[in-house]
């Protein structure tokens, strides 16, 4: 997702449809 946000990258891949 975003290189500056490593956490967001994993979060986006797991709960993409929720948000």
Swiss-Prot record:
Catalytic reaction annotation: an L-alpha-amino acid + O2 + H2O = a 2-oxocarboxylate + H2O2 + NH4(+); L-leucine + O2 + H2O = 4-methyl-2-oxopentanoate + H2O2 + NH4(+); L-phenylalanine + O2 + H2O = 3-phenylpyruvate + H2O2 + NH4(+); L-methionine + O2 + H2O = 4-methylsulfanyl-2-oxobutanoate + H2O2 + NH4(+)
Role this protein plays: Catalyzes an oxidative deamination of predominantly hydrophobic and aromatic L-amino acids, thus producing hydrogen peroxide that may contribute to the diverse toxic effects of this enzyme. Is active on L-Ile followed by L-Phe, L-Met, L-Val, L-Arg, L-Leu. Exhibits diverse biological activities, such as hemorrhage (minimum hemorrhagic dose of 10 ug), and apoptosis. May also induce hemolysis, edema, antibacterial and antiparasitic activities. May also regulate platelet aggregation.
Cofactor info, note text: Does not use FAD as a cofactor.
Keywords: Antibiotic, Antimicrobial, Apoptosis, Cytolysis, Disulfide bond, Flavoprotein, FMN, Glycoprotein, Hemolysis, Hemorrhagic toxin, Hemostasis impairing toxin, Oxidoreductase, Secreted, Toxin
Flavoprotein found in the keyword field: yes
Entry's Gene Ontology BP terms: apoptotic process; defense response to bacterium; killing of cells of another organism; venom-mediated hemorrhage in another organism
A cellular component term, taken from the record's GO annotations: extracellular region
Subunit-structure text: Homodimer; non-covalently linked.
Protein name (database record): L-amino-acid oxidase
Post-translational modification comment from the UniProt entry: Contains 2 disulfide bonds. N-glycosylated.
Expressed in which tissues: Expressed by the venom gland.
């Amino acid at each position: 997702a975003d290189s500056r946000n490593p956490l967001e990258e994993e979060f986006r891949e797991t709960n993409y449809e929720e948000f």
